[in-house]
Amino acid sequence: MIVQRTAAPTGSVPPDRHAARPFIPRMIRTFAVPIILGWLVTIAVLNVTVPQLETVGQIQAVSMSPDAAPSMISMKHIGKVFEEGDSDSAAMIVLEGQRPLGDAAHAFYDQMIGRLQADTTHVQSLQDFWGDPLTATGAQSSDGKAAYVQVKLAGNQGESLANESVEAVKTIVERLAPPPGVKVYVTGSAALVADQQQAGDRSLQVIEAVTFTVIIVMLLLVYRSIITSAIMLTMVVLGLLATRGGVAFLGFHRIIGLSTFATNLLVVLAIAAATDYAIFLIGRYQEARGLGQDRESAYYTMFGGTAHVVLGSGLTIAGATFCLSFTRLPYFQTLGVPLAIGMVIVVAAALTLGPAIIAVTSRFGKLLEPKRMARVRGWRKVGAAIVRWPGPILVGAVALALVGLLTLPGYRTNYNDRNYLPADLPANEGYAAAERHFSQARMNPEVLMVESDHDMRNSADFLVINKIAKAIFAVEGISRVQAITRPDGKPIEHTSIPFLISMQGTSQKLTEKYNQDLTARMLEQVNDIQSNIDQMERMHSLTQQMADVTHEMVIQMTGMVVDVEELRNHIADFDDFFRPIRSYFYWEKHCYDIPVCWSLRSVFDTLDGIDVMTEDINNLLPLMQRLDTLMPQLTAMMPEMIQTMKSMKAQMLSMHSTQEGLQDQMAAMQEDSAAMGEAFDASRNDDSFYLPPEVFDNPDFQRGLEQFLSPDGHAVRFIISHEGDPMSQAGIARIAKIKTAAKEAIKGTPLEGSAIYLGGTAAMFKDLSDGNTYDLMIAGISALCLIFIIMLITTRSVVAAAVIVGTVVLSLGASFGLSVLIWQHILGIELHWLVLAMAVIILLAVGADYNLLLVARLKEEIHAGINTGIIRAMGGSGSVVTAAGLVFAFTMMSFAVSELTVMAQVGTTIGMGLLFDTLIVRSFMTPSIAALLGKWFWWPQVVRQRPIPQPWPSPASARTFALV
């Protein structure tokens, strides 16, 4: 309770206007108008000579890709090896039809591909799977109504060149007229990032409007004065314009880089901080005026009581945000310098422009006079309760903190940026169209490359390549693996060993009828042989008869020779007797004319032939005897010949049976082999995969090689699709398994020792997850150390600095837990992975401000004793700090209107943290700890628990004062 007590009526003593004043506030007050004009000129120059912050952010946007991450290194190396470009920016163009895509859609697609390939400035390469028959089925949906092509763009994701490339691709697509019923979407990671930046820039103006609306309402509620609120808004607007202009100037001249997150956070943080500092300054000025000080004294009291707090607060925020520069992820790294520079500008404006405006406006009547007394009594009652029951109040504050802390174990994060962007963004619409026909992972694949020291375009290495693909496909959660051995995600048809064997029997199948005809002709030969056998048997019978006849003829001829010789002898006797008569016939000249003569002469000539005949018969007899000898031998040979013919017949029949059975068996085997090959093909079983060497000369296959093997054949890549969302925790967890599977698959093979590179969506977010953990640790520890040092310098107390930092950490955990409770468990939206790091750094910095102001005020009042100092500090700073905290909290919560859900989550998390810090930590927890620790709170400083007794002031120096 405050009691106004007045000393004896000896007259008040006017303040000494010639007393020594601090140099800096005196110079600011003296040159207030030039300072204001200087700031106005600077602000005008900065905002006129360079474009606005949003425009500069678009022009000088930096890449959000972590270049040092293994996945980024892998993707760039893959692009270099395959000669497809050196950027990490890729877009997907999706064609969706109401009916299966036909020739018209394909013609449009070919025309679009030609236009894209012609734009070498923005398009580095294409993966034209749909245009190649070998891989077409892999790029078209199962219902035939959608197809896609991947385009590698110039510039890394997030850079102005990448965003320009996305716009160039969109322009090319928009200028082409698709067939009726076909829609074309430009989507993919690069398009999503570009749309995110545009959405963030659109949201920034809305956020600024909502923020100023919130600030105006809060200021009017707190100060109940339009003029005071207008003056404070002027200070805030000028500070914001200076910050925007300064950062835009540095960004425009490429001194610093900017991102969507940096510009959004910078604007809101600058507004909130500038508002806080304006509240600190004007609040302390009005408090001094309320205690009876004149305007000049109140000005110096204001500056002396808040300048070090504003400086410490600003340096804390600037230093903590600058610690983000030590991180490795560009998402955080790009925030560090812009936010730190922006906060330095805000602090500079608050410590120069703010006091100058107060110095000028305080000279004009009652512009800054308090319209009502500050609510000191209520806050002093809170301070008195804390001093009286510090333990229970501290326990109650900790219990409230446990509400959020107990929620933290259930915290889950999400890496899918699509879930945090409006569904009507063009890139999101493209993703939605793709997901109507493809799995979610098809648009976000992984790419694994194995790089060896030799050319892999041979059958042996292709066996290993297929082994790698099978090993990756066997990893749990992998739904599809595309490689040269499975271009469309399934094994190439007719590449199993059983099928190749069945194909080798194709020629046998073609000659089967011919062989069967030849076998059938063997029966004809058997019939011919049988006919020969029959004839031979008849010949044998005839030969036997001939032998018998010949033998009889020899016997008869032997007798005939004797008879003929006897006949010759008798004729010789006759001739000897009639020789004289015979001679007459030869002497007669006219014997020819005398018939009797010529007849008798002819008889005698005939008798002369008996000798010749006898001689011939004698010569014939040995021959007949020889024939008589041979004929039995010939007859004896005939049965053997007949038996041989019969044996030939039997062999021919046996051969026929064998050939016929063999042919039937081969036909059956061919049918089994063909059935086995067809079964292996139908089952997509590539356990016995093999590509014969002649396949590598096939022109179609060579086109497929270009897609999956590097130009020199030393590297092969695999396109991997997950089951479900690759950006989920489960998808991220598969990355290590994929690498392990590939590494194990090449053990003991010709590819052992080859380098393995893995990039893609889940791989990148795994690196982001790992980097986020590392960056959070680095930024958090460095920010805590920096904040502790600043608090130590400001309070000159190790314990007080430790308490401030400790309570801020506790507040951070509680507020983040509350954010998890609201967003994850109530709204059903998991917190984006960026939220934790951004909220932690800003809450660490901003949360320490209000504790710092409280402890600084407590330090001013400590001469009255610890307990009394706590009560006075609570009464003097309670309303100001609460107003500042509420304004800052609701200002950050204005992010809730952003199109970027991640910024809404960051803003609400920081806002809830500031509310908890303002209403619980600063109001109850920190003063309770100070009351419990007593003089140890100020160690190593020495303070008294109670004030040193002093004599009652003399009447001559009596003044109106306040007693507790």
Curated annotation (Swiss-Prot):
Cell division as UniProt keyword: no
A GO cellular-component term linked to this record: cytosol
* Compartments reported by the entry: Cell inner membrane
- The answer to whether keyword Ribosomal protein applies is no
The membrane topology term of the UniProt record is:
Multi-pass membrane protein
**Pfam families, alphabetized:** MMPL
Expression induction: Repressed by MmpR5. Repressed by iron. Regulation is IdeR-independent.
Listed A to Z, the keywords are: Cell inner membrane, Cell membrane, Membrane, Transmembrane, Transmembrane helix, Transport
Tell me where the transmembrane regions lie. 31-51, 203-223, 230-250, 255-275, 302-322, 340-360, 389-409, 773-793, 803-823, 826-846, 880-900, 923-943
Family per record: Belongs to the resistance-nodulation-cell division (RND) (TC 2.A.6) family. MmpL subfamily.
Function per UniProt: Part of an export system, which is required for biosynthesis and secretion of siderophores. Overexpression of the system confers non-target based resistance to azoles, clofazimine and bedaquiline, via an efflux mechanism.
Q: How does it assemble?
A: Interacts with MmpS5. Can also interact with MmpS4.
Which protein, by its recorded name, is this? Siderophore exporter MmpL5
Species name for this entry?
Mycobacterium tuberculosis (strain ATCC 25618 / H37Rv)
